[in-house]
């Protein structure tokens, strides 16, 4: 769902938050959208996510702060988080006040020079990335120190690389994850800027593991370990068979759901090179779930 921002009366631009003071309440607008979708479609209200780019990233933080009872997890790309003092003094919004452990994914660029998304922050208005991750790591009670992993530099011509930083073991198994684009600008990786990662795919892979209660199946013990980086799902789109490679554990359940959340196919992966016949499905978008991971597939 892509909400349309209202026109700012001062400069004619589309903005999620009109210049103060204003009678507009964008958070109430988003809540009304969620209510409307819930009343008309079979959505899972425990798995409502938010994501945004630039000012949309700032707004995603606001939803995480002010509509936390409806937002399971969220992601922000090239957008910062308002400093509480600025939020209170200028916008009269009150402090950020999340009420449940909330998984957060940030994808910032270290060379982003926009005032509202610079990596080092823009005091006293916008927090730095380090301040943001510290805030959510503290709120979620995660490990103090992140696990830092370099991402393969698969594209040498984009002028940037990616470093993954993840704070694990939060309450209800939630995590805070940063995909730092080193030398990255005000970009959406995978579409423009860095090409080592695809921001759209990274967002869904991360958020879809959580619901309003935290990590789905948190606390369940299992001997099965899935290395998501080794999973290959192709061709996608497809009209006949979908190949699933890289699952090294046998007898792992998989499920496919339609856009209404209805189960349409399920089975067991009994080989590390498995094929699923989806030829009988209607041409549409579906969700494949393997363990805690979800993937969008397109039936032609």
Model-derived regions: residue spans:
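C-terminal outer-membrane/trafficking sorting elements
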Residues: 225-300
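Solvent-exposed loop/turn segments at secondary-structure junctions
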Residues: 6-10, 54-58, 79-83, 110-114, ...
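The feature captures the conserved acid-bearing segment of alpha/beta-hydrolase catalytic domains
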Residues: 72-73, 78-148, 153-160, 167-171
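Short glycine-enriched nucleophile-adjacent loop
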Residues: 57-68, 78
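Serine-hydrolase catalytic machinery in alpha/beta-hydrolase-like enzymes
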Residues: 1-49, 53, 62, 66, ...
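Extracellular/periplasmic catalytic domains that process cell-envelope and extracellular macromolecules
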Residues: 42-44, 51, 55, 66-69, ...
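Alpha/beta-hydrolase-fold serine-hydrolase catalytic core, especially in secreted/extracellular enzymes
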Residues: 102, 137-224, 262
């Amino acid at each position: 769902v892509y909400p349309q921002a209202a026109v700012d009366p001062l400069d004619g631009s589309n903005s999620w938050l009109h210049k103060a003071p204003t009678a507009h309440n964008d958070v109430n607008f988003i809540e009304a959208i969620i209510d409307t979708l819930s009343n008309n479609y079979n959505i899972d209200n425990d798995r409502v996510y938010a994501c945004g780019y630039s000012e949309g990233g700032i707004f995603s933080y606001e939803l995480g702060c002010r509509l936390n009872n409806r937002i399971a997890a969220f992601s922000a790309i090239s957008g910062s988080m308002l400093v509480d003092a600025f939020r209170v003094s200028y916008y009269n919004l009150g402090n950020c006040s999340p009420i449940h452990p909330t998984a957060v994914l940030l994808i910032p660029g270290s060379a982003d020079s926009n005032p509202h998304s610079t990596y080092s922050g823009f005091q006293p208005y916008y927090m730095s990335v380090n301040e943001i991750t510290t805030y959510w790591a503290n709120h979620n009670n995660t490990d103090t120190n992140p696990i830092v992993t370099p991402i393969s530099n698969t594209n040498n011509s984009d002028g940037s690389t990616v470093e993954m930083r993840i704070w694990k073991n939060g309450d209800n198994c939630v995590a805070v994850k940063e995909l730092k684009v080193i030398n990255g600008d005000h970009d959406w990786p995978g579409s423009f800027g860095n090409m080592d990662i695809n921001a759209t795919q990274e967002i869904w892979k991360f958020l879809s593991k959580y619901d309003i209660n935290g990590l789905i199946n948190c606390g369940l013990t299992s001997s099965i370990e899935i290395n998501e980086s080794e999973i290959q799902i192709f061709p996608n789109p497809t009209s006949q068979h979908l190949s699933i490679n890289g699952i090294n554990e046998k007898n792992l359940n998989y499920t496919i759901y339609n856009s209404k959340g209805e189960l349409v196919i399920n089975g067991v992966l009994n080989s590390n090179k498995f094929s699923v016949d989806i030829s009988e499905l209607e041409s549409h978008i579906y969700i494949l779930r393997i363990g805690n991971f979800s993937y969008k597939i397109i039936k032609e």
